[in-house]
């Protein structure tokens, strides 16, 4: 057959409903049943084919449909600042091991912007897109380091449990505040924390009480001193480059990093608007 991967990209709204049944709702139910039968039949004919379900509208990210898909992505071209908010929110609907999150890397992006989208990839199954062939050596160095850390964190994402911390974000299209997403492995021996700061008036630090523990830092991904000092607050533009250029330092000094207090309280020094950091923890 020659096929190893198939993507069903469905980005339509429901409109006024579905014709041909007693009601629009019944018509929709029949359409969903037929779609489920299609996916189930495909799995029988091509049992080794990986199936991705893509639905920016969201109505294909539904449990009865997701059981037929190996992966589901809410968008393959999401470059707006609400990316980490949507990805974290979908932990309530889609198993994280199935939740595809696209990190779109642009050649004009500075270190802060690259970290923002790469960190969002740690909220699901990270997929890279964008200007990959044109990235500089420094940009690829950061991306490779993120991928290496992601490989270590994969078991936590696959079988863990998610905890949300941070103030309520009232407008996702123009987000203000911050979020810390804590994912604890099933055996409670490792944990992954993904921090994102948005716009508005930001605190100097964001912190949370970690479940379980005590914990120690295994590895982290954060900004260099140069990038961390570039923007200390306010509402810097998050799109798409957000900075002066792509030629940042290849080696991270991680000044805008996480600190553990007493092994259970995690403190993140927020470097500025639309920034991010990731840390992998292990039990002490």
Residue ranges and their predicted role:
Residues 118-163:
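Catalytic cores of secreted or luminal carbohydrate-active enzymes
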Residues 9, 51, 121, 193, ...:
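Hydrophobic, well-ordered secondary-structure elements that form the walls
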Residues 257-284:
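C-terminal beta-strand-rich structural cap/linker in extracellular carbohydrate-active enzymes
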Residues 170-213, 278:
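Carbohydrate-binding surface patches
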Residues 106-118, 184-187:
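Structural motif
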Residues 211-225:
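Solvent-exposed beta-hairpin/edge-strand motifs
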Residues 1-111, 134:
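Active-site neighborhood of glycoside hydrolase catalytic domains
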Residues 224-251:
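Intrinsically disordered, low-complexity terminal tails and inter-domain linkers enriched
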């Amino acid at each position: 057959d020659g096929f190893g991967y198939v993507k069903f990209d469905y980005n339509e709204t429901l409109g006024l409903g579905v014709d041909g049944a007693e009601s629009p709702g019944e018509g929709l139910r029949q359409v969903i049943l037929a779609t489920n039968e299609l996916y189930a039949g495909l799995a029988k004919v091509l049992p080794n084919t990986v199936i991705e379900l893509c639905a920016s509208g969201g109505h294909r990210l539904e449990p009865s449909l997701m059981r037929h898909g190996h992966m589901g992505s809410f968008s393959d071209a999401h470059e707006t600042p609400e990316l980490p908010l949507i990805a974290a929110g979908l932990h309530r609907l889609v198993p994280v091991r199935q939740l595809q999150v696209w990190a779109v890397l642009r050649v004009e992006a500075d270190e802060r912007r690259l970290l923002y989208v790469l960190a969002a990839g740690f909220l699901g199954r990270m997929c890279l897109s964008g200007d990959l062939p044109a990235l500089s050596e420094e940009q690829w160095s950061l991306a490779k380091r993120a991928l290496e850390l992601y490989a270590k964190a994969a078991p936590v994402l696959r079988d863990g449990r998610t905890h949300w911390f941070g103030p309520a974000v009232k407008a996702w299209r123009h987000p203000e505040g911050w979020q810390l997403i804590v994912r604890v492995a099933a055996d409670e021996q490792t944990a992954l924390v993904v921090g994102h700061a948005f716009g508005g008036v930001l605190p100097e630090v964001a912190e949370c009480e970690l479940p379980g523990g005590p914990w120690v830092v295994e590895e982290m991904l954060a900004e260099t001193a140069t990038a961390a000092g570039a923007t200390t607050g306010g509402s810097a533009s998050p799109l798409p480059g957000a900075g002066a250029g792509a030629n940042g330092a290849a080696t991270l000094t991680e000044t805008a990093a996480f600190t553990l207090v007493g092994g259970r309280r995690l403190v993140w020094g927020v470097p500025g608007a639309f920034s991010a950091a990731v840390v992998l923890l292990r039990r002490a």
